[in-house]
């Protein structure tokens, strides 16, 4: 049986990856991490979506230790989310080590259930520039997991080279445009769906959606062309 594990937050990107995986794999598991994120509603949204979409299993893991080690506006209510980059060139929403931990735990879970594929919605074209969302990082993590577990695990990143407009097209391609638009939580201020409209995440999401709706046919054609080039 062809199994996959999706790293799932309940946001736009991971939900798009989840619906795509459900169309491609025999059995899909979702794994969500409780790391003390700014909005506890994220966990509830992920649980509701996993149930609605009918995943084989949805595991919520407590990794709140990360909150004690990594200071970020995504984990601390007293740190406002800022549009400005810090001295290190990263936004204050960067949680150091987050995806290292998430992919390691997802790899352990995949090993235990006999899945060979891990799917994550990280993306190099996102505005953030997080180092643990880059393609070279994912390839390095993939190599480490394979060597450390002596198992042929593959980390898939369906969104790695897509912009936000094309990510909306991918959701639409998998018959999930409305679900992703109305039921996911991407907003830094904890508002489901279209969000607050002001935070960096909402701005990126809104611009991408409007562009897709205005240029639907051309963008879908561009997405299909990219997919054919990668296959």
From Swiss-Prot:
Residues that span the membrane, as ranges: none
Residues where ATP binds: 8-18
UniProt xrefs under InterPro entries: QueC, Rossmann-like_a/b/a_fold
Residues that bind Zn(2+): 187, 196, 199, 202
Catalysed reactions listed for this entry: 7-carboxy-7-deazaguanine + NH4(+) + ATP = 7-cyano-7-deazaguanine + ADP + phosphate + H2O + H(+)
UniProt GO MF annotations: ATP binding; ligase activity, forming carbon-nitrogen bonds; zinc ion binding
SUPFAM superfamilies: Adenine nucleotide alpha hydrolases-like
Cofactor: Zn(2+)
Keyword Ligase in annotation: yes
Pathway the protein acts in: Purine metabolism; 7-cyano-7-deazaguanine biosynthesis
Entry's cofactor comment: Binds 1 zinc ion per subunit.
GO process terms (BP): queuosine biosynthetic process
Enzyme Commission numbers on file: 6.3.4.20
UniProtKB keywords: ATP-binding, Ligase, Metal-binding, Nucleotide-binding, Queuosine biosynthesis, Zinc
Class of the enzyme per the UniProt entry, highest EC level: ligase
Its job: Catalyzes the ATP-dependent conversion of 7-carboxy-7-deazaguanine (CDG) to 7-cyano-7-deazaguanine (preQ(0)).
Similarity comment text for this entry: Belongs to the QueC family.
Name this polypeptide is given: 7-cyano-7-deazaguanine synthase
Organism (species): Vibrio vulnificus (strain CMCP6)
Biological classification of the source: Bacteria, Pseudomonadati, Pseudomonadota, Gammaproteobacteria, Vibrionales
């Amino acid at each position: 049986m062809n199994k996959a594990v999706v790293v799932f937050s309940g946001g736009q990107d991971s939900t798009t990856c989840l619906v795509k995986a459900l169309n491609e794999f025999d059995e899909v598991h979702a794994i969500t991490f409780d790391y003390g994120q700014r909005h506890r509603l994220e966990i509830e949204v992920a649980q509701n979506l996993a149930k609605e979409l009918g995943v084989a299993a949805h595991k919520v893991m407590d990794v709140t230790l990360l909150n004690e080690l990594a200071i970020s506006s995504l984990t601390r209510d007293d740190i406002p989310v800022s549009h400005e980059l810090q001295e290190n060139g990263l936004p204050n929403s960067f949680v150091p080590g987050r995806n290292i931990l998430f992919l390691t735990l997802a790899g352990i879970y995949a090993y235990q259930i006999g899945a060979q594929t891990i799917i994550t919605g990280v993306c190099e074209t996102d505005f953030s520039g997080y180092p643990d969302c880059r393609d070279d990082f994912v390839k390095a993590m993939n190599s480490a997991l394979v060597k450390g577990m002596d198992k042929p695990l593959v980390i898939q990143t369906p969104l790695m080279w897509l912009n936000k407009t094309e990510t909306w097209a991918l959701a639409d391609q998998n018959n999930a445009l409305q679900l992703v638009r109305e039921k996911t939580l991407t907003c830094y201020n904890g508002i489901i769906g279209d969000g607050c409209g002001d935070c960096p995440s909402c701005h990126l999401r809104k611009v991408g959606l409007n562009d897709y709706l205005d240029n639907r046919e051309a963008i879908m054609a561009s997405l299909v062309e990219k997919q054919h080039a990668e296959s």
